[in-house]
């Protein structure tokens, strides 16, 4: 959370040197933490507070946790609790983390996007079971609601044969296009890899070398025995254990 606050207030790790386009839920959570030093749990049971902010930043968790989907799911829930503690946000992040880890481990699109029964009930469980496959361009939603973003991203990747096609389809859904694109990009990148990204796109990425170096560092850090430390130090309630 302190890192998030530094990004918000001082622009740390922002390519422009300042925070921009921060979501409402994230801003409120960071404001509360900056004031109290505690996680406030804003909007835990409010479906109107179930935004996509914790889903769009998930890739580093999957890189660190690879190739263990259970570790990835646990860390994904914990990172969501910091700013988006709603149960549906945690569930969406946990499910998506599993997809990312399987793809990073070499799973192809059909394997990663297979119908699943993960014990999740409700909307996230329906997506896991393949409900997105029946959607059309006219019926898919690309709003800022975490479930809509999750489904739209998976739908775009599932209907595409390469990274470029998936991203163009995702962002052209409109709505919360940048976040839907970010989520689709995580999954498409994990499935098709760096080589699947058009070189002309890679050339335009700000801080490209820095991002690539940190991605590799996360993968290497995840291989160490101390990888489980973040889980061991934090209980299921989200509080640090003594």
Question: What are the roles of these predicted feature ranges?
Answer:
Residues 1-242:
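Structured, active/binding-site neighborhoods that engage oxygen-rich ligands
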């Amino acid at each position: 959370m302190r890192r998030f606050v530094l990004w918000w207030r001082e622009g740390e790790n922002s390519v422009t040197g300042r925070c921009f386009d921060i979501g409402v839920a994230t801003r409120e959570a960071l404001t509360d933490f900056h004031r109290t030093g505690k996680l406030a749990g804003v909007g835990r049971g409010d479906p109107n507070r179930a935004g996509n902010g914790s889903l769009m930043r998930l890739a580093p968790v999957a890189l660190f946790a690879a190739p263990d989907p259970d570790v990835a799911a646990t860390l994904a829930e914990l990172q969501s609790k910091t700013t988006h503690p709603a149960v549906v946000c945690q569930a969406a992040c946990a499910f998506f983390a599993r997809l990312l880890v399987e793809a990073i481990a070499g799973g192809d699109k059909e394997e990663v996007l297979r119908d699943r029964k993960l014990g999740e009930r409700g909307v996230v469980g329906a997506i896991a079971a393949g409900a997105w496959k029946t959607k059309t361009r006219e019926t898919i939603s690309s709003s800022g609601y975490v479930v809509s973003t999750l489904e739209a991203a998976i739908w775009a990747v599932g209907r595409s044969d390469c990274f470029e096609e998936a991203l163009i389809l995702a962002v052209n859904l409109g709505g919360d296009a940048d976040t839907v694109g970010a989520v689709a990009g995580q999954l498409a990148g994990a499935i098709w890899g760096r080589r699947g990204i058009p070189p002309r796109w890679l050339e335009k990425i700000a801080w490209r070398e820095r991002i690539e170096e940190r991605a590799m560092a996360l993968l290497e850090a995840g291989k160490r025995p101390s990888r489980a430390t973040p889980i061991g130090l934090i209980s299921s309630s989200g509080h640090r254990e003594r």
